Amino acid sequence: MQQIVLASTSPYRKALLEKLTVPFVCASPDIDETPRIGENAIDLVIRLAESKARALATHYTNHLIIGSDQVCVLGNSITGKPHNKINATRQLQQASGKCVSFFTGLALFNSATQSIQSIAEPFDVYFRTLTEAEIDGYLEKEQPWNCAGSFKSEGLGITLFERLSGRDPNTLIGLPLIALTQMLQKEGLNPLTVRNE
């Protein structure tokens, strides 16, 4: 069985991949994540997911390398990680009462055969109307500065929503496990039949 590499140091993605109970290692890809001029959200997350997976191929030459990246879109604007409270407050104010679309790019690169599978998995988040006090309270308690959209859906962020819409809730956290399982199966690796030694 080819070994699996997660091209990420995100504790959230690592925890998600652990759900599949397949052995893997994590490694940090070093890529430029700057969006290209005129690049839409779907093209951006697919390009970044593929770039992250391919970036590790020189060190992992006979592996299945998983790359993932996520952006959120409000209106026609791509919104990234807030990095601080001022930006997070602005993002949540803009999202209040609206639908925010998330796109998670997923790539599985077989470094031995040089074949790659990739998708952009959509997920919609419908925010309820939020008060300033709720936004402040949430940001104070959870400090989601590293999260696209300024929330952690796996934590207190769930209280910000009216409803969620998508085929895989793991997509919102950063790693679409349903799609990943399908990709792994195409490479001959089924998480349900892998023996962990």
Curated annotation (Swiss-Prot):
Keyword Lyase: no
Cellular compartments per GO CC: cytoplasm
A UniProt-annotated Pfam family: Maf
Organism: Pectobacterium atrosepticum (strain SCRI 1043 / ATCC BAA-672) (Erwinia carotovora subsp. atroseptica)
Active site: D69 (proton acceptor)
Cofactor(s) this protein requires: a divalent metal cation
Annotated positions for site Important for substrate specificity: Y12, Q70, E154
UniProt similarity note: Belongs to the Maf family. YceF subfamily.
GO-annotated biological processes: nucleotide metabolic process
Cellular localisation: Cytoplasm
Recorded GO MF terms: nucleoside triphosphate diphosphatase activity
Role according to the record: Nucleoside triphosphate pyrophosphatase that hydrolyzes 7-methyl-GTP (m(7)GTP). May have a dual role in cell division arrest and in preventing the incorporation of modified nucleotides into cellular nucleic acids.
Enzyme class: hydrolase
SUPFAM superfamilies: ITPase-like
Keywords assigned by UniProt, alphabetized: Cytoplasm, Hydrolase, Nucleotide metabolism
Catalytic activity line of the entry: N(7)-methyl-GTP + H2O = N(7)-methyl-GMP + diphosphate + H(+)
Enzyme nomenclature, EC number: 3.6.1.-
CDD domains per record: Maf
Primary site of residence: cytoplasm
The organism's place on the tree of life at top rank: Bacteria
Full protein name: 7-methyl-GTP pyrophosphatase
